[in-house]
């Protein structure tokens, strides 16, 4: 895609702080991080979201996170944990599939919580979802 920011980063048209790169994926620091080392992992081919990305690409990305990128973050930044998140459609600012790796530190104040008071009763939701 010509106007995709992440495609421009892959092509080298926009600078980035690369953490890891191979022929299929690129991992780089998020310029609006939630913690030190907040990294975005993207496929080098353009797919808009999880649902348009081939399973083998997703599998490769997850394996690369586990075996290549996480060890870099752990060894270089001495992280205590890792929050992994990914948005589709609503909440997805860049329409190029990407996974957020948010390093966690024992001293951080980052919380991944939502206001459950605005959510429907779990029994009502279950009734809508269960098979008849």
Task: Name each region found by the language model.
Residues 1-132:
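HIT superfamily nucleotide-processing domains
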């Amino acid at each position: 895609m010509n106007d995709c920011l992440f495609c421009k980063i892959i092509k080298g048209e926009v600078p980035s702080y690369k953490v890891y790169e191979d022929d299929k994926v690129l991992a780089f620091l998020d310029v609006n991080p939630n913690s030190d080392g907040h990294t975005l992992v993207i496929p080098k081919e353009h797919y808009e979201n999880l649902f348009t990305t081939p399973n083998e690409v997703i599998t490769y990305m997850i394996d690369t996170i586990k075996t290549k990128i996480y060890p870099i973050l752990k060894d270089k930044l001495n992280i205590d944990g890792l929050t992994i998140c990914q948005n589709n459609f609503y909440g997805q600012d860049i329409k190029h599939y990407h996974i957020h790796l948010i390093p966690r530190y024992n001293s951080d104040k980052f919380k991944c919580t939502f206001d459950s008071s605005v959510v429907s009763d779990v029994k009502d939701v279950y009734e809508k979802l269960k098979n008849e």
